Amino acid sequence: MLPLLQLVPAKLLNSSCSLEKTLQCSCSFHGIPTPSVQWWMGGVPVGVDGMDGSLQVTSTMLGPWANSTISLTEEPEMGMRLLCEGKNQNGTHALSILLMSRKSSLAAQAFVKGLIQGAIYAGIVIALLFLCLLPLIVKHIRKKQAKKAAAIRAKKSSKVRASQELEMSLKPEEPGKPVVATFSESRILEKQDKRAS
């Protein structure tokens, strides 16, 4: 009588991915009975031991071991999922791999480059705008300063006039110098001259 084999569910024991000219991912499963291996790309099953467009699958089974390798000859789309699934009648075990395109790093570099260029262009536009507005700003400042200076001069000249008028009214008349007076002042002066003579 043959000994009964103990049934073992499929279990993933090893997996790896490498990128050279092509992307290669491998999965190794163990189980009794020997698990079957199925690859899924973006939710779609990939054919076993054959070519499927840009995908090539190679599988080998030896005793309780099942090994499978998938090769991608083209770069995957951004965020594409690759699933390696091993199963037998006692269970299923799977590994999901998120594929990232090398182009995605280029997209990030392009984004950063565009961001830097945008900042430089914005700086240039702001500088040109400032240079265009600078004459208007200077003109406005000079007008304000001229108004202030005119107000100060007017204030000073009114003070000077007031002090000169005060001085003139306090100065005694010099003999023989003509006196300029208004009509009412000249009448008063005439009356004073007549009384004196």
Curated annotation (Swiss-Prot):
One cellular-component annotation, GO: membrane
Protein name: SIGLEC family-like protein 1
Region described as Disordered: spans on this chain: 160-179
Assigned keywords, A-Z: Membrane, Transmembrane, Transmembrane helix
Family matches, as Gene3D superfamilies: Immunoglobulins (2.60.40.10)
Residues making up the signal peptide according to the UniProt record: none
Cell location: Membrane
Comp. bias intervals (Basic and acidic residues): 162-176
Chain ranges passing through the membrane: 118-138
Membrane topology: Single-pass membrane protein
InterPro entries associated with the record: Ig-like_dom_sf, Ig-like_fold, SIGLEC
Primary site of residence: membrane
